[in-house]
Amino acid sequence: MEKTRLTVLQEMWLFIIVWVGQLIALIGSSTTAFALDIWVYDRTGSVTQFALVSLFNTLPLILISPIAGPLVDKWDRRKTMIIADVLACLGTIAIGVLFVIGRLEVWHIYLANTFTAVFMAFHTPAYTASTVLLVPKQHLNRANGLMSLMFGISLIIAPTLGGVLLTIVHLQGIILFHVTAVFIAFVSLMLVRFPEVNTSAVATAKSSFLSEATYGLTYLIARPGLLGLVLFSASSFYIVGGINVITIPLVLNFVSVSFLGTILSLFGIAIVAGGLLVSIWGGLERNIYAIYGCMLLSGVFIFVAGLQASLVVFTVGIFLFFLTQPIVSSSTQAVMQNKVEPSVQGRVFAIKGAIEAAAFPLGYITIGPLAEKVFEPLMATNGSLAGSIGQIIGVGSGRGMGFLLMIMGVLTILETSIAYLYPRLRFVEDELPNVNAVAIAADTASSKNDAVSLIS
């Protein structure tokens, strides 16, 4: 067993070096984002302006990703990550300078977030597409589990660390911490050399920029199984967005704001636990079955979370829901990495990222109003459903959101059942050949197990 674990570490060594650097950078950026959120809300007291901070973080990613994908496929992916990390950090540095000289305004943060998000639109597909170059096929699920783990760790650490640092070193100290974190990520990338991608004829053929920008979508449409997988994956992002917008007001029906952070941290721990589980376990040989199974369980857990007016039931249900999400995301990534040629992964993953990024805020803007304007009035003490469904699940504040969660759970189960009946998706791992760079990655890993490959 010990020898097996040592072998796994040796075969994933280069990926782990990059992963550690990116984890530290993500903690730095997430801590800064938390601090800026607090600054905006304290400065304005406006929920709308607070929400706009997230919008300016997300919208550029959706708009720029189709353009970034073709460029990522043409550029060296390691250098793309380095340049994107450094340039994105410049926006944070500008915020720090403006804060120190006392000239920082809310619109500066919107602008800086937009600036940063543009470069992250290049960084994300470059990082995702690099995984298959650094990791042998049998460890792709582990690598993707570590990537889920990375986001879970940042979700737990950033709010706590941000709160402490705001008190001790204030905003300028947090920005200095962010710059230091990016420098560490820069060093980790400088220590490794990524294998070169063998550009296929289709990838190198001359074409218009518009066709290049839409190539990722065209590629998916030509492979209905992969398109179905991306849309199925995006539905989980939509659900997460909906749960996020419901969680805070629903939990505040039971506890104070001071205890809310503890509940949210538990959900972050669930993501970390799920990521660790995948990293250690390695996932099922048939990834699509892991996706189906976890999505089905997700629906059950969401349904249970809304079933009673109980903080314990809600917390356990949503905790278990978030526990399944790293398995869904890592298994989805593994299928995509196995079935999409490395030379076009930048374009395909950019489109995938844009679709998923759009699904998340869509959950916010649809589930939130539905909960507030439709379901809460229906389940009020004198609401239209108080005498029927209300007799089963209760009435009053929060019960409308609970009922909406139950409906989301049922729809998730129904969606999963329909997805299972779609043969192109169910047999996607059989019908499409494996085209990843396993040989390149394996050769590279085996030749560099004893030492980190320095840039020549």
Give names to the regions the model predicted:
Residues 16-36, 54-72, 76-91, 108-167, ...:
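Substrate-agnostic recognition of the 12-TM MFS/MFS-like secondary transporter fold
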Residues 34-48, 245-258:
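Short amphipathic helix-loop junctions that connect adjacent transmembrane helices
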Residues 32, 41, 94-99, 116, ...:
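MFS-fold secondary transporters
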Residues 53, 63, 80, 94, ...:
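C-terminal transmembrane bundle of multi-pass solute transporters/carriers
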Residues 102, 129, 133, 175-206, ...:
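Helix-loop junctions on the cytosolic side of multi-pass membrane transporters
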Residues 44, 76, 98-103, 307-309:
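Helix-breaking motifs and short loop linkers at transmembrane-helix boundaries and internal kinks
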Residues 11-19, 47, 103-106, 110, ...:
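Primarily residues marking transmembrane-helix entry/exit sites
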Residues 2-15, 195-231, 440-454:
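Juxtamembrane intracellular "pre-TM" segments in multi-pass secondary transporters
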